[in-house]
Amino acid sequence: AIYIESPGTYTFEIVDIKKVIEICKKNNLKSLIDNTWATAIYFNPFDFGVDIVIEAITKYISGHSDIMMGVVLGNNEDLIALQRWSKNTGNYVSPDDIYMSLRGLRTLPLRLKKSSQNSLEIAKFLETKKIIKTVFHPALEQHPDHELWKRDFKGASGLFAIEFHDNVYEEAIDIIADNCKIFGIGSSWGGYSSLLSTMNVSENRNLKSSYVPTGNYLRTVSYTHLRAHETRT
């Protein structure tokens, strides 16, 4: 099987999913994709021929940072095997978690739209700062995979990353993170809070991408109204 994550973690490369599916079909391989970033609102993997879709309910679908849950979806052929595996392993979730996930689904389009708008506004603002080397946001025109993103996706969610220039030390980045007034510190995303985290991508990634930055600053934007915070920044 071939497992896809699009966009890729940390540097947000967009995978050419159509080509991957062609390879899978030619070689009789199953295709799997993590669709947590885009959700079905902005990308439907089954329309591209993907066999199995994985999403973290914990993130955007829940939207309130109060559920730890995931979902695996498949077509009719694979669904039977997935259901059998779930039954044999006793891998079930509580009715309350399902109820709360349905609650999140009802507001997902509105929340995701606002998160997308805010993240792009902040990404464009950060592009103008000399201290920042790269903004990894596929909705930006200078992103190397922007055209591929436009072809396959209906939108971009609130998660993106920025890279500082090499002369900005990690300690300085940590100080910047600690002094942010709007963003809290956290590695999760997709909830009601605006969070950020710092990391060195070269130390946190098993597979090398075409471009591995020396240091990264991961940010996620909630649907908080930016204008309400302008006097605090």
Model-predicted regions and their roles:
Residues 134-222:
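Conserved C-terminal alpha-helix-loop-beta "cap" of PLP-dependent enzymes
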Residues 82, 172-176, 227:
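Hydrophobic side chains in well-ordered alpha-helices
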Residues 71, 78, 198-199, 224:
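Ubiquitous "structural anchor" signal
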Residues 1-131, 136:
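Conserved PLP-enzyme active-site core in the AAT-like
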Residues 15, 77, 167-171, 226:
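Short coil/turn linker and secondary-structure boundary residues
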Residues 224-231:
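Conserved small/polar residues in nucleotide/adenosyl-binding loops
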